């Protein structure tokens, strides 16, 4: 009887402990979700502020986000990855918040000025990792590595091929496409330029999908 009573007491202790742990984990998850909601609102406000700082840029971010999500979808990525691709597109230049206006507006930058300008990439990574509380790194990594080139001649770290995070490879071609379209270049021309840069600037799969999307758009207009 004593052994049974002891076993019952132990089982009751572990059941109660498990319940307390579950309650605590639920509270932590709820708090993280609340923090993420706040973080998303903060980053959304920063995107709007950056759009006001650089005329036309907010539309560019939305365009890149839409392209990145569609590429991810066509590559068979899951719902979360597609959502991450969209978020990365919105935030890929968020680090511009920390760059002087004079450097953003000028095109004839000196080597030293261009080095300062390039810091928008790590600044963006730092902003996203600071505000995003769940520990998921896909969006931050996509932003951090989206200026890498598929052949290893990009920046910041000179990564090449599969070493570049997948969403960064998607983001690179989405950014290029939207940027060139906003210069007034035709979808067919941009598609051709992208295909010419396969294995150099862009991953072939993402490049072909982006080119196909542009060709479809050209036919539809």
Residue map of PLM features:
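Short N-terminal helix-initiation segments at or just after the protein's N-terminus
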Residues: 9, 32-34, 112-117
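Polar low-complexity intrinsically disordered regions
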Residues: 1-2, 221
